[in-house]
């Protein structure tokens, strides 16, 4: 805890950037162990900002029906709160102390649209995902599951799904975990990476809640809908995209 402190304050990508920066520090020999993650407390003023941007769902009287990422009837995000941390560690150090190893991060990328603060750019999202694949030495054919950012906003879902489809087509199962607990902003990258890893370990992947009819403007993907799916895979990709045009992509390998 007395080593490097790398604050990540990039809204919806803060948690995933923290994990990625910690991984890079260990990979380059600057650290042996790092605690990485994100946290977000539900704040009225924060909710007001999203309301002002017309980004939040209006289904206050039907909370079980929202958010509905990628659905043709989606009407915005639902703000959540939470926290999640991962212990990242150099492999030999973890083995030497007898640590339980859950998975291996093999790829990470982050970039910036350098365009508009609230209008995501599909092309830059795609580049970020491709860069994480290249870092991991993988191709699209190697991926077994994708954890989508999937906020249920109009432009965000369209841009993300189109970028994902440009790489994977409809060959890789994908779902949005925000449909269960809302958008936890700075925490979502850490929470979703951990949950996705646990699903891969169990071979059970949750569907996107409230997704019944994918929007035709969204990319043609293999959306997990209705029921969970049993998938035996070796790699997953966890993607997050933030206001400000910040993009992140993490690839995790199942530990045998």
What are these regions (language model features)?
Residues 1-21, 30, 53-78, 161-190:
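Conserved catalytic cysteine-centered active-site region
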Residues 5-40, 78-99, 184-205, 250:
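Active-site-proximal alpha-helical scaffold in enzymes
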Residues 5-10, 31-39, 100-108, 141-148, ...:
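Beta-strand segments within the central parallel beta-sheet cores of soluble alpha/beta enzyme folds
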Residues 15, 22, 50, 87, ...:
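Conserved small-residue
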Residues 41-67, 110-127, 151-163, 187, ...:
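Active-site-adjacent elements of ketosynthase-type condensing enzymes
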Residues 61-136, 145:
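Condensing-enzyme catalytic core mediating Claisen C-C bond formation in acyl metabolism
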Residues 86-90, 134, 164-165, 251-255:
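Short beta-strand-to-turn element immediately C-terminal to the catalytic PLP-Schiff-base lysine
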Residues 136-142, 219-256:
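Flexible, low-complexity linker/loop segments at domain and module junctions
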């Amino acid at each position: 805890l007395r080593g490097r402190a790398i604050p990540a304050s990039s809204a919806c990508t803060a948690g995933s950037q923290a994990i990625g920066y910690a991984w890079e520090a260990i990979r380059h020999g600057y650290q042996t162990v790092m605690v990485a993650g994100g946290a977000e407390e539900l704040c009225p003023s924060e909710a007001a900002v999203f309301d002002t941007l017309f980004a939040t769902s209006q289904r206050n009287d039907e909370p079980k029906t929202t958010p509905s990422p990628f659905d043709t009837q989606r009407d915005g995000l639902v703000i959540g709160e939470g926290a999640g941390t991962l212990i990242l560690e150099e492999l030999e150090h973890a083995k030497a102390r007898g640590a339980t190893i859950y998975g291996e991060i093999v790829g990470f990328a982050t970039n910036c649209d350098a365009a508009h603060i609230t209008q995501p750019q599909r092309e830059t999202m795609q580049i970020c995902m491709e860069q994480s694949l290249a870092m991991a030495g993988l191709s699209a054919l190697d991926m077994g599951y994708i954890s989508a950012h999937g906020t249920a906003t109009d432009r965000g879902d369209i841009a993300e799904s189109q970028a994902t489809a440009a790489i994977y087509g409809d060959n890789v199962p994908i779902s949005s975990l925000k449909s269960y607990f809302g958008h936890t902003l700075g925490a979502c990258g850490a929470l979703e990476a951990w949950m996705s890893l646990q699903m891969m370990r169990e071979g059970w992947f949750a569907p996107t809640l409230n997704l019944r009819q994918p929007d035709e403007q969204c990319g043609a993907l293999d959306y997990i809908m209705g029921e969970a799916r049993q998938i035996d895979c070796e790699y997953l990709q966890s993607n997050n995209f933030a206001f400000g045009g910040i993009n992140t992509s993490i690839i995790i390998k199942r530990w045998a």
